[in-house]
């Protein structure tokens, strides 16, 4: 069975991160974009990638407070509902610093910025910010510590069975190195990887594939 599978247009899936934090996953848009709502037991929620269908995202949020909308990278299939959701919720938008200018140009939204090594805190939720240069210059992943497993939101930088698309060999080398050193090296095999499209996977499932990815160059 695919891990945390959600069909496009279907109901959201609930994932227990720990006793205090839930994760809600929904697929929106025409290319199976994942949006993730990190929902603590108390305090404001965090939305990762306001990709599309602002009405469905707002229905998912309901009357809950959203304190931040974090965009994993600048591509428009991940920012299509950003302006509407920020307006609807009053949430603070965030993104990786190198992608901020491009996001503002396409959405009109000025994001506060984060980058590799930052610790993002909102209420009781803490996210390790991981810069992954390759799919875009400012792509980020977010590590949420859980029990029994950590959860990493990788945008379009890492998927089941492959890395994200890159525009050339230099970008691939950069992304491969960042993913190996910053995601796989410090992670346990039970760590769950939540990509920007499709099903989740685990570090343990993907770690044996790293030499293959390196050899084939994608």
Regions found by a protein language model. Give the residues of each.
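Metallo-beta-lactamase
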Residues: 45, 131, 137-218
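A generic "binding-loop/recognition-motif" signal
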Residues: 31, 52-53, 75, 99, ...
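Conserved S/T- and glycine-rich ATP-binding loop of Class I adenylate-forming
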Residues: 38, 72, 132
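Active-site-proximal loop/helix segment associated with metal-binding centers of metalloenzymes
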Residues: 2-5, 9, 16, 25-34, ...
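Conserved beta-strand hairpin/beta-sheet module of binuclear metal-dependent hydrolase folds
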Residues: 11-64, 141-155
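Active-site HxH/HxHxD metal-binding segment of metal-dependent hydrolases
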Residues: 44-45, 52-128, 150, 209-212, ...
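Short Gly/Pro-enriched turn/cap motifs at secondary-structure boundaries
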Residues: 26-28, 111-112, 131-133
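Short beta-strand or tight-loop elements
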Residues: 19, 123-128, 138-140
């Amino acid at each position: 069975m695919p891990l945390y599978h959600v069909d496009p247009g279907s109901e959201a899936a609930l994932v227990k991160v720990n006793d205090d934090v839930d994760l809600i996953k929904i697929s929106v848009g025409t290319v199976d974009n994942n949006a993730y709502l990190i929902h603590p037991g108390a305090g404001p929620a965090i939305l990762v990638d306001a990709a599309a269908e602002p009405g469905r995202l707002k229905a998912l949020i309901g009357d809950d407070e959203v304190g931040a909308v974090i965009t994993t990278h600048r591509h428009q299939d991940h920012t299509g509902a950003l302006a509407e959701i920020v307006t609807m919720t009053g949430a603070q938008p965030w993104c990786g610093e190198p992608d901020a200018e491009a996001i503002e140009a396409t959405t009109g939204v000025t994001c506060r910025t984060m980058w590799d090594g930052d610790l993002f805190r909102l209420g009781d939720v803490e996210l390790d910010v991981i810069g992954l240069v390759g799919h875009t210059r400012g792509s980020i992943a977010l590590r949420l510590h859980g029990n029994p497993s950590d959860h990493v939101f990788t945008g379009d930088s890492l998927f089941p069975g492959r890395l994200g698309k890159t525009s050339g060999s230099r970008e691939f080398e950069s992304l491969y190195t960042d993913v190996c050193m910053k995601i796989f090296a410090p992670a346990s095999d039970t760590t769950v990887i939540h990509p920007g499209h499709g099903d989740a996977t685990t570090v343990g499932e993907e770690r044996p594939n790293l030499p293959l990815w390196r050899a084939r160059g994608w």
